[in-house]
Amino acid sequence: MRKTSLALAISALLSALPIASVQANESCTPLTGKEAGLDTGRSSAVRCLPGINPLQDLLNSGQNAFSPRGGMAGNDLNLWWAHRTEVLGQGINVAVVDDGLAIAHPDLADNVRPGSKNVVTGGSDPTPTDPDRCPRHSVSGIIAAVDNSIGTLGVAPRVQLQGFNLLDDNIQQLQKDWLYALGQRRHRRQPGLQPELRMSLVDPEGANGLDQVQLDRLFEQRTQHASAAYIKAAGTAFSRIAAGNYVAQPHRNLPKLPFENSNIDPSNSNFWNLVVRAINADGVRSSYSSVGSNVFLSAPGGEYGTDAPAMVTTDLPGCDMGYNRVDDPSTNRLHNNPQLDASCDYNGVMNGTSSATPNTTGAMVLMAPYPDLSVRDLRDLLARNATRLDANQGPVQINYTAANGERRQVTGLEGWERNAAGLWYSPSYGFGLVDVNKTQPCSRQPRTAATTGAVALAKGKGNGRSPSAPSRYVGSSPTRSSTQVDQPLTVEAVQVMVSLDHQRLPDLLIELVSPSGTRSVLLNPNNSLVGQSLDRQQLGYVRTKGLRDMRMLSHKFYGEPAHGEWRLEVTDVANAAAQVSLLDRRTNTRSTLTEGNNSQPGQLLDWSRGYSVLGHDAARS
């Protein structure tokens, strides 16, 4: 045990650090939860947390988290009322599946329960031994750092933790280990925190591979029958991605669209994964955060901790391990600062949707003590009570010249829009920022909503497959194909599985239109599917003809009626040469990859075969 705790050191140094004056404080008294007329919002006059609080995800008062500046007060999970009424995650187990968990860390040891697994050694201690394997250990602190007046505080500080190092570089990832970590040993209402997989996103990947199908089935079964919740990171490649020896990013003159659309990763288009993207301390999308129609919620993720606040959380213990170490200096004032953290057990630079995901996990845990709620009930409550951030966010428009010479403008990605069921949705924020205090009282009330029953599935039928039809050629005017849903369902989400041929996939805008007229961008143009261009440059031939069973998910139609005609639209919105900037990581040299326009039109092959509306009986809504 350290002689000087981080919490005490922060208290002693407050006069020297430009931290906002409104801080959590020791006079912040417990509440019963029965106080009449109490304002539990983010601007409440009684908003506070006990102790000295450097954690803007729990209570953002504008503090700087040891970075040069603070954020905008109120952009947090709004959980102060839940914590002060002793809703702290008691009796809930969380499995963190990633690259390790230091089970002896002073902020985590009291919350670690038996059942962890080190896949490398076969033992029960998944503590990382590689000094660079730190991100997911930091994740555990965001969820479950215990309230011991030593260091940081987790969203659910009395939750129980297990760790599985499935993403350790020293192992072969076997399907049996994934199935064990994600599916077996589950207790009722056990959130499973899924990793942010670092997969290549330059080539499309179908969702019908055996491994993906097995995991999809597992997630469905455990969610439906064992009340397990799976929370997944949207990705951190809004502006650039790593692909082999290169870092690729769009040319600087393109409209500000996401390079990585979160739907490109097939695990992100699984309905049973609740996909989360990150906001920063100013209450807008974190600069790195991937977005897409599959995003369900937003949660704090921060920036990099050097220019603006990141997360303050646990680090691998010791000054030669993790983020906070003597051989890796940082401008974040927590790092290499013996007055604050002599043992280097904490860091102030954790960020990413890998931070937003544990924040959401902890928030769901705080709803979990109510066993009558299904996981879909919890999702419904979180969506309907989320806060609409960046409310004036508008669409990103694309201008292009059609084949007939006409100038056209289309929406490459929507801003905030209200669907036909009256719910606000944005692919950049999902339904909005998690609000624990607003949601938690609703979770105490008996649920009569249809989300308490089994999920209903509607398949489309109609003209979704006709490879030889001339109307299926993909050009500069929308190629439209429709399918009919006859079941009277209320939509929770829609999945489509698209197959098409095209020589330059980043040119394509793919949209889905509901019977109510709501339009959702499933895949934006100017995206990261540049594998065809890289192949031509490096191999002289192309391995990818187009999309094959690429699954995409949209939550934008939540609450709308499913009955009626659904329409897929595919448009080629570029006919000039396209450019991608490349950084060769071996030589640190930069180049520009230039690709001419496709020499022949694309062709939509199929989409209704994998089309599904997931929802519930409209009569029960």
From Swiss-Prot:
GO MF, one annotated term: serine-type endopeptidase activity
Signal peptide: 1-24
Entries under PROSITE patterns matching the protein: P_HOMO_B, SUBTILASE, SUBTILASE_ASP, SUBTILASE_SER
Class of enzymatic activity (EC top level): hydrolase
Family: Belongs to the peptidase S8 family.
Keywords: Hydrolase, Protease, Serine protease, Signal
Full protein name: Microbial serine proteinase
